[in-house]
From Swiss-Prot:
Located on the platform of the 30S subunit, it bridges several disparate RNA helices of the 16S rRNA. Forms part of the Shine-Dalgarno cleft in the 70S ribosome. This is Small ribosomal subunit protein uS11. It comes from the Bacteria. GO terms for molecular function: rRNA binding; structural constituent of ribosome. GO terms for cellular component: ribonucleoprotein complex; ribosome. PROSITE patterns: RIBOSOMAL_S11 (PS00054). GO terms for biological process: translation. It holds the Pfam family Ribosomal_S11. The keyword Ribosomal protein applies. Belongs to the universal ribosomal protein uS11 family. Keywords: Ribonucleoprotein, Ribosomal protein, RNA-binding, rRNA-binding. PANTHER family: 40S RIBOSOMAL PROTEIN S14/30S RIBOSOMAL PROTEIN S11 (PTHR11759). Part of the 30S ribosomal subunit. Interacts with proteins S7 and S18. Binds to IF-3.
Amino acid sequence: MAKPAQKLRRRERKNITSGIAHVSASFNNTKITITDVQGNAIAWSSAGAQGFKGSRKSTPYAAQVAAEDAGRKAQEHGMKTLEVMVKGPGSGRESALRALQSVGFQVTSIKDVTPIPHNGCRPRKRRRV
């Protein structure tokens, strides 16, 4: 028996003026999530979601494209000002921040929230190329 067709859920347009952009820049990918002040996700994007595959995901250009996409989605909900929280050692940190500013957001603060261990877990072995 066939399943009933799922209803298409439209994204309701929220009216939020300020929010937080969480930029997670790893060595392999860059993810950008834009949330309201409480932490509820409004828009997100990543380098992989923009069609970049493999080692191209880790480039600054891929991070820029992903940040512009997430920024445009957030602006549809009326967002104007952002706090930016950057996490991780990746190459897309600065380019994602610059892209968010170029989309037209007023960036009020920039925080680096990269987790630094106080000698916790043993790190992975060094790469020898």
